[in-house]
């Protein structure tokens, strides 16, 4: 509810999503999802998410997320994460709301699950992508999905500046910050904030060999397309 209130306070700047982050999936995940589902139902709206699709968009939220799988710290709730992820993927299919997907040390498991629903998925974002060309190509085999690229791309050790132009067209990227984490250079090590996305833009525009204006225009269009922000 606080997220919705914030989005109403800053219309056109803050947009709400709803979902259970994998790091929050514990033994009580079913209860947590039941509460989120209740909120989702409370915010049904009329109209179509896609004029060419008879499936109605039923929520004030713009996406189901941030959801996914995270096995970096622990696999204690591995099965619970898989089940919670699958349930929320079904929400996305039902509502036609795109997915915002978090995946850490679990791409094989994530892809295996998504393949089961590939023809039904409305699209979304693979958030905070830091993988290689092969991994990027695998994720982009899902139609209407884009890669979210953040501050890691500005790090000296990052291979993204080479791998992305080689494997990912500009119309399959959106810019992110993942605030308050992973601040881009020259703010690395400090608290990240959304305003720092300009540094990601500068880095990727240079990597793709285009102007910052052109890259910004394209990635803004990508955001509007994925989240149906017309």
Regions from the PLM with identified roles:
Residues 1-230:
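Mid-domain alpha/beta scaffold segments of enzyme catalytic cores
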């Amino acid at each position: 509810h606080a997220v919705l209130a914030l989005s109403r306070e800053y219309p056109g700047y803050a947009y709400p999503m709803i979902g259970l982050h994998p790091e929050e999936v514990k033994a009580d995940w079913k209860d947590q999802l039941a509460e989120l589902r209740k909120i989702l139902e409370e915010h049904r709206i009329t109209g179509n998410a896609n004029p060419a699709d008879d499936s109605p968009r039923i929520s004030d939220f713009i996406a189901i997320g941030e959801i996914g799988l995270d096995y970096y710290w622990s696999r204690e709730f591995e099965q619970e994460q898989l089940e919670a992820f699958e349930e929320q993927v079904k929400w996305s299919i039902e509502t036609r709301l795109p997915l915002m997907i978090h995946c850490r040390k679990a791409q094989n498991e994530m892809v295996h699950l998504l393949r089961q629903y590939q023809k039904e998925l409305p699209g979304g974002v693979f958030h905070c992508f830091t993988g290689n060309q092969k991994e990027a190509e695998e994720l982009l085999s899902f139609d209407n999905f884009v890669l979210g690229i953040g501050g890691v791309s500005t790090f000296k050790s990052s291979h993204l500046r080479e791998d992305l132009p080689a494997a990912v067209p500009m119309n399959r990227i959106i810019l992110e910050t993942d605030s308050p984490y992973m601040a881009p250079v020259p703010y690395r090590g400090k608290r990240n904030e959304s305003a720092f996305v300009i540094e990601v833009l500068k880095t990727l525009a240079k990597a793709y060999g285009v102007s910052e204006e052109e890259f910004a225009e394209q990635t803004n269009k990508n955001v509007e397309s994925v989240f149906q922000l017309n």
